[in-house]
Amino acid sequence: MPTTSSTATHDVVLIGGGIMSATLGVLLQKLEPTWSIALYENLDQAGLESSDPWNNAGTGHAALCELNYSPMDKNGRVDVTKALGINEQFWITRQFWSSLVVDGTLKDPKSFINPLPHMSFVWGDDHADYLRARYEAMSAQPVFAGMEHSEDPEQIRAWAPLLIEGRESGQRLAASRHTGGTDVDFGSLTRQLVTAMAGAGAEVRFGHKVTGLTRGTDGRWEVKVKNKAAGSEVVDRARFVFVGAGGGALPLLQKSGIPEIKGFGGFPVSGQFLRCTDESVVNQHMAKVYGQAAVGAPPMSVPHLDTRFVNGKRSLLFGPYAGFSTNFLKTGSYLDLPLSVRPHNLTTMLDVAKDNVDLTKYLVTEVLKSRDKKIDALHEFYPEADGGEWELITAGQRVQVMKRKGRFGGVLQFGTEVVTHADGSLGGLLGASPGASTAAPIMVKLLERCFPAKTAGWDGTLKELIPSLGHTLNDDPALLDEVRTVTDAALKLA
């Protein structure tokens, strides 16, 4: 058994080397450059779990094409409230990245973000009617101005020829398109942010697994960390801890013993994609094209055919195909889910199971799908696809939040959930999509909750980094145009 060989003391400890910890670390260095920061990551590099480009779809989620963010209500009206919120969040993230490029923290923006049209594509009368109504509702909003819509197959062919080639005529098709979308390599971005953190004085440790998180008698958090290569342990005593360990955040927050984590559970959903690198195919498609989710499918399982830019190379991705695994991390253990069950979240989890029979059936069906069935799903988007040109890859784990509702009930929540201790000394993030795209606003929100006495003093620096902070761009078209112009130039998107 390894023994504790040393102790360390830091103002801030970040657990996990993904996009959230990286974003928070850089933010804190801008706001409090004298604070000491340590980051511990279990794997050998930053951004290898959920942030890795092949473990997610790389969509800069701005609600331009994702139909689940703009549902139709019971009165037949498309509700764009959630879409507006997500779009505003991505503008905050874009401004943050732009400021980091301008000040030299990030180097070549092309290494992590590229302009790419975002499209929605459906077929059948009901779906086409919905997409028309969505287009009318969305295009009336300043942040979505410039959206195009067509039911003409030839126009859709001009936008994305693979969708039309070989498709039977007579089927009603509809597509909406916005040229302001992006593809993001969150793995590359994360690694650049962590490198910048280390260069600014943060202590970054890879191959270090956090095994314990308890409160010391003096109020500091004692973070027990195992050096996997050396077999030694260190206890890092920190004033503030952020648990940004992706799917691994729930077990660590449970170990902390904070009352705010009571009632929370995790529902892991695995995923696979089909990937094509054949240039003769890849060069015919330049868009992210999102469709409608199947009945009972979770939002992260909306099918989409995407252009990807990874390590300077273009490829296509189709999926995701959802599945179920009890791992909370791709590199985790099958015991992750059962070991997360506690008396305080058991009723939450049972109630969620009872109310989500359709989801369970859907996941079982997806798990049992053969490769041929997966190719059949691809053919619905790309009729002439040759299955031999596509390889099946396993994506990252998405641990959806199960949250207490009432005294004994529970609800399955899609999205992210910030959990903080009452005294602000500990914060963590649960959940998944849109996740990475909203890293900057989520981390700003976490800072406001954990350091309320500091926020007034930080306001000036935050507004230098994110000029629109505190404003709603959709209500201020002039500011929106200014932010778009500045960020397009800095990120080389124009």
From Swiss-Prot:
Gene3D superfamilies in the cross-refs: D-Amino Acid Oxidase, subunit A, domain 2, FAD/NAD(P)-binding domain
Enzyme class at the top of the EC tree: oxidoreductase
Names of required cofactors: FAD
Enzyme Commission number(s): 1.1.5.4
Alphabetized UniProt keyword annotations: FAD, Flavoprotein, Oxidoreductase, Tricarboxylic acid cycle
GO MF, any single term: 2-hydroxyglutarate dehydrogenase activity
Pfam family, one: Mqo
Reactions listed under catalytic activity: (S)-malate + a quinone = a quinol + oxaloacetate
InterPro entries assigned: FAD/NAD-bd_sf, MQO
A biological-process GO annotation: tricarboxylic acid cycle
Keyword Flavoprotein: yes
The keyword DNA-binding is assigned to this record: no
Pathway where this protein functions: Carbohydrate metabolism; tricarboxylic acid cycle; oxaloacetate from (S)-malate (quinone route): step 1/1
Family, as annotated: Belongs to the MQO family.
Descriptive protein name: Probable malate:quinone oxidoreductase
